[in-house]
Regions:
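Sec-dependent N-terminal signal peptides
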Residues: 4-14
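Boundary at the C-terminal end of the N-terminal hydrophobic targeting segment
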Residues: 18-20
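Outer-membrane beta-barrel channel domains
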Residues: 22-218, 289-295, 299, 308-330, ...
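Ser/Thr/Asn(+Pro)-rich, low-complexity disordered segments
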Residues: 82, 461-464
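Signature for the C-terminal beta-barrel architecture of outer-membrane proteins
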Residues: 138-140, 166-373, 385-393, 398, ...
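Outer-membrane beta-barrel "beta-signal"
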Residues: 214, 474-492
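C-terminal closing repeat unit and adjoining cap/tail of repeat-based domains
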Residues: 453-457
Length: 492
């Protein structure tokens, strides 16, 4: 069997080599950061930690994880295989041990391995997939590890790029249905692994999340309807992911958490309008035994004030490989935008971790707790999670070689978290549509500047200040980095 498999792989490689283009990836990013953000709980305590990680600071453990993995890798090494219909990406991204970025708050640090008394993060790879595109782009299929982002805004409510990667199988079919209208159907399967300790499965495991979406679009308008089914505590069957039927009432309430989502985007001249409405549960007054109402919503507007040339600098982060929706966003020139997000108290939640719409993550750390597992490390949907309201104002300008943007945001978040108990007592403790308990208010302002005289060579500088108005504390961040895509540079 092994010999036959090897022979098939050799034959496949020989066949595609006739039409394939092999593109090496050798990207370096070196940066220095000053960050006096207060540190949080470190190590195994995070497994049972709930809410704020520091009593004088607004961040939860999900915020710490997101911030750590948002920083670029020191080295991306691998290749991209490009054929007429089949593409493949194999990538190893070399980071510092991720716990260094959490432990070394309140000081200057870099992403270069073996500095700051740190070695390599062993949790890679975070990108690796193969995909297929049929003639005329009718069918698309992707299998592997990469990010996915659905939705027209900066942040998604259903599936977002708030986690480093998702192990997934992705299928799409797109077809014209009239002179102006197109129809698109997406089907996605996401796999998660839940472990407390070696050989011991976490409560509620296994976990598999399915999503399907029906979309209609024309040159000025898009609307999509999404349904997500999180199956936990059992191995899924065809009933759980049957492609066309609705999943919301498949008689598996004890093993299934279903979310529905609607997204709209429209273009009116130089203005883009967009919004989403997401529902996890909805309780009527006559239904006291159901789960509490859980909804999310977003709305935004973007104005292309002055048209211009789009920025041509290379994207070095793993998000360049993400599966993302098409958008009416106009790149280049001056853009002004405002976005609003609301996520109610009980969104994404269930009594066991595997039932929540979260992404688990296992860290292999040689400077921290060695093998460490967090079952609610990232939100599958909205970055800031349930019980939150978020405002984002952005002004950006970009041309061929540089771009600059200014951002101001206001976050309000209650004190009931995704890790809080989800039982009968807590389901009735808070008004499901109001921010729960004590509310933390956070104001942040910042600016980013990128200059790339050549597409694969550039520098980034960013500065931001965050003020926790509730706890009367603040943090300043300064980032400066240089990037070079060596393979791209040598090819030119």
């Amino acid at each position: 069997m092994k010999k036959a498999l090897v022979f098939i792989l050799i034959l496949f490689a020989a066949t595609i080599s006739l039409t394939a283009k092999l593109i090496p990836v050798l990207d370096f990013t070196a940066f220095l950061t000053f960050d006096n953000t207060p540190g949080g709980i470190e190590g195994f305590d995070w497994r049972s930690a709930n809410g704020l990680q520091n009593p004088q600071w607004w961040e939860t453990k999900q915020d710490y994880w997101y911030d750590a993995f948002e920083k670029p890798a020191f080295l991306n090494l691998g290749f991209e295989l490009d054929t007429d219909k089949v593409d493949m990406v194999v990538l190893v991204d070399v980071l510092q041990d991720i716990f260094v970025q959490i432990r070394d708050r309140e000081k200057i640090y870099t992403n270069i391995p073996f500095l700051n008394k740190a070695n390599l993060d062993l949790s890679f790879p975070r990108v690796g997939y193969i995909d297929y595109t049929s003639s005329e782009h009718l069918i698309y299929l992707s299998v592997g590890r990469r990010q996915i982002k659905w939705g027209p805004g900066t942040y998604g409510m259903a599936i977002s790029d708030s986690q480093p990667y998702l192990d997934n199988v992705y299928f799409n079919v797109t077809s014209g249905i009239s002179d102006r209208w197109k129809f698109s159907y997406d089907l996605v399967a996401l796999a998660f692994k839940h472990y407390l300790d070696i050989g011991e499965e976490a409560e509620g495991a296994p976990q598999t999340t399915f999503a399907h979406r029906f979309s209609f679009s024309n040159p000025n308008f898009r609307i999509s309807f999404t349904e997500m089914n999180n199956i936990y505590g059992k191995v899924p069957t065809f009933l759980d992911w049957t492609p066309i039927a609705l999943w919301h009432n498949n008689y598996q309430d004890d093993c299934s958490n279903v979310i529905v989502d609607m997204a709209i985007e429209a273009k009116l001249g130089s203005v883009r309008l967009f919004g989403t409405l997401t529902m996890d549960d909805f309780r009527l007054a006559e239904e006291p035994n159901t789960n509490p109402t859980a909804i999310g919503a977003s709305a935004g507007a973007e104005w292309n004030v002055i048209s211009g040339n789009p920025f041509l600098g290379k994207e070095f982060s793993n998000s360049r490989y993400a599966i993302k929706d098409e958008s009416f966003h106009v790149p280049g020139g001056l853009n002004l935008s405002y976005e609003f997000y609301y996520c109610s108290t009980y969104m994404y939640n269930r009594a066991v971790s595997a039932g929540k719409f979260t992404s688990d993550f296992q860290i292999n750390s040689n400077v921290g707790p060695k093998k460490f597992y967090d079952d609610d490390a990232f939100f599958l949907g909205f970055k800031y999670g349930p019980g939150s309201i978020f405002h984002l104002l952005s002004l950006s300008y970009e041309s061929t070689e540089y771009k600059i943007d200014f951002k101001a945001s206001l976050l309000q978040r209650g004190s009931y978290y995704i890790d809080s108990p989800y039982d009968d007592e807590y389901k009735s403790k808070y008004d499901p549509l109001r921010l729960p308990g004590d509310v933390t208010t956070v104001l942040s302002i910042g600016s980013d500047f990128s200059y790339y005289p050549q597409g694969g060579i550039g520098m980034d500088v960013s500065v931001s200040y965050t003020r926790d108005l509730t706890h009367d504390s603040g943090a300043f961040k300064l980032y400066a980095g240089v990037k070079i895509a060596i393979a791209d540079y040598l090819s030119h």
